């Protein structure tokens, strides 16, 4: 007997699931394993790819602005010679050349000389003495090598530089004298340095060759007298009292062989009123004691070393 096996009925919810699902089934990718071994080239290529790839989270690089190109002077198409400008020309000149050019211009244009005089700064004592020392150095270098430096031959060899020094001394000295110079300290400082330069003048065997040296002493002595008189009129001669000029002038007179004695006497007369009625004793022991007392009184130190008596008088 043939029996038919009935197929079990399909539940109704199965049909509903089939109806809602997509008619195209999703296919999952399958990885087919290969038996090929990895090579070193593959690893290197993979590593280079990873290193060359920029990360997605790396910050963006902002481009930097390049510096502006320097501007250079454009070369002239036609090269030709031309004279220097005035500033460049003056840079090539030394001091002597500038003095010569300025002197020549002042000689051709007298009005320019007055402008130069009023525009130039006032010469100082140090600058004037330096000029005199330069003339003195030139004089010393002009002496002939060997032989007698006091002979007539040596005098003839150095006559020109000696005259230049004495002329410069005669020109500079009135500039530092009153009334043109109002500061007594400036005048005294210049005379002190100028007298030292006269002391260094050469001595000659022939008396007639020493006339110029003696004349220089006479002129500087008159300058000392003029400055001392003007300084004594101002502030009671305070500049003469505390500058030690009495000792300096006495030393100059000694080096000059007594040719500045008139200036020493003038200084003694100017300071005589501080020594009492006996002004002739200036420079003696009594005069020195009075000067010491005067200095102590004016400086406020008089009587500091005297013991003070305590108790009934």
Swiss-Prot record:
Span of the signal peptide: none
Subcellular location: Cytoplasm; Nucleus
GO cellular component: cytoplasm; nuclear membrane
Biased composition (Low complexity): 21-33
UniProt record, GO biological process: nuclear protein quality control by the ubiquitin-proteasome system; proteasome localization; protein transport
Keywords assigned: Cytoplasm, Nucleus, Protein transport, Transport
Biased composition annotated in UniProt, kind: Basic and acidic residues: 39-50
Region (Disordered): 16-84
Record flagged with keyword Transport: yes
Molecular function GO terms recorded: proteasome binding
Entry's family note: Belongs to the cut8/STS1 family.
Subunit architecture: Binds the proteasome.
Descriptive protein name: Tethering factor for nuclear proteasome sts1
Biological source species: Neosartorya fischeri (strain ATCC 1020 / DSM 3700 / CBS 544.65 / FGSC A1164 / JCM 1740 / NRRL 181 / WB 181)
């Amino acid at each position: 007997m043939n029996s038919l096996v009935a197929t079990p009925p399909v539940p109704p919810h199965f049909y509903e699931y089939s109806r809602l699902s997509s008619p195209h089934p999703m296919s999952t990718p399958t990885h087919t394993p290969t038996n090929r071994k990895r090579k070193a080239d593959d690893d290197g290529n993979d590593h280079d790819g990873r290193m060359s790839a920029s990360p997605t989270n790396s910050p963006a690089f902002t481009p930097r602005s390049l510096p502006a190109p320097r501007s250079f002077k454009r070369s002239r198409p036609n090269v030709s010679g031309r004279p220097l400008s005035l500033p460049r020309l003056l840079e090539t000149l030394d001091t002597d050349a500038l003095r010569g050019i300025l002197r020549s211009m002042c000689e051709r244009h007298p009005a320019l000389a007055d402008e130069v005089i009023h525009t130039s700064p006032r010469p100082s004592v140090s600058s004037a003495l330096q000029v005199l020392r330069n003339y003195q150095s030139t004089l010393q270098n002009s002496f002939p090598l060997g032989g007698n430096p006091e002979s007539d031959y040596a005098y003839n060899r150095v006559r020109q530089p000696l005259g230049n020094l004495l002329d410069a001394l005669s020109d500079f000295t009135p500039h530092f004298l009153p009334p043109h110079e109002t500061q007594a300290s400036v005048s005294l400082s210049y005379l002190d340095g100028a007298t030292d330069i006269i002391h260094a003048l050469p001595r000659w065997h022939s008396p007639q060759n020493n006339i110029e040296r003696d004349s220089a002493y006479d002129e500087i002595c008159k300058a000392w007298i003029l400055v001392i008189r003007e300084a004594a009129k101002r502030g009671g001669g305070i500049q003469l009292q505390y500058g030690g000029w009495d000792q300096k002038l006495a030393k100059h007179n000694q080096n000059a062989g007594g040719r500045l004695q008139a200036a020493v006497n003038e200084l003694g007369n100017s300071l005589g009123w501080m020594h009492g009625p006996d002004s002739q004793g200036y420079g003696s022991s009594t005069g020195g004691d009075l000067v010491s007392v005067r200095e102590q009184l004016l400086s406020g130190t008089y009587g500091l070393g005297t013991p003070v008596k305590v108790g009934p008088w």
